[in-house]
Amino acid sequence: MLDCGMSKKYLLEKMQECNVNSKAIDALLITHTHSDHVKQLKAFSHLPVYSVCPLDVGVRVQPYQSFQLNDLKITPLAASHDAEGCCGYLFENEGQKLLYLTDTGYVSKVNLDWMQNLDYYILESNHDVEMLMNTSRPFALKSRIYSDTGHLCNEDCGKILALCAGDNTREITLAHLSEEANTPQKAYDVVKSYLVHYKGLLQVAHQREVVQGGTE
């Protein structure tokens, strides 16, 4: 399981919707220490925990140093966010690769090298810049979100995917959308405009709705 910010009851209900047996979950990976990602750590204390960020529990792993978890090869990729040790994860199994990367203000050249021609991408498309600037949020918060230690906008997400997606890529999911400074349709349209040659599935993860993927 990746992060645990929602209530345990909510998470278990969503697992049921996906026909996932919660008893089959044997580890918890944490991306960073913001409360919306770690609030339920105690509720899942029976699981071994892996993180780059400093926690009171679990195993501390290092960016770009792969480790094995059962049949998964997992590589943490350092993210640029206002939380120590924030990361995304690259998962590899039976020749297929999946990237999960949200909560980052930009994507480094090092990460781009790791992200080339993957089978699956789950990438942040957090905000539309104009919508963000037109919100009633304090300017300091807008600046934080827009900064290199904030979140990826739709345009940057599209540019990154245009650089990375290749012939192996079959599914792209846009994630971590702001409800106030973005819309699913806007995120989809902007990113789609950059993926001129991409023929696979492009979908948007809505908040509080189950999104499933995987073509096999």
Feature-to-residue mapping (PLM):
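Active-site metal-binding loops of divalent metal-dependent hydrolases
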Residues: 4-6, 33, 79-82, 102-106, ...
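Structural motif
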Residues: 24-27, 96-98, 120, 171
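Short amphipathic alpha-helix with an adjacent loop that forms part of the alpha/beta core around
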Residues: 15-19, 65-71, 111-114, 162, ...
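Conserved beta-strand hairpin/beta-sheet module of binuclear metal-dependent hydrolase folds
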Residues: 1-18, 85-103, 120
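Cap/insert and terminal regions of metallo-dependent hydrolase folds
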Residues: 109-206
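Metallo-beta-lactamase
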Residues: 48-96
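Beta-strand->loop->alpha-helix junctions that form or flank phosphate-binding loops
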Residues: 27, 59-62, 200-209
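Active-site metal-binding motif and surrounding structural segment of the metallo-beta-lactamase
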Residues: 7-52, 119
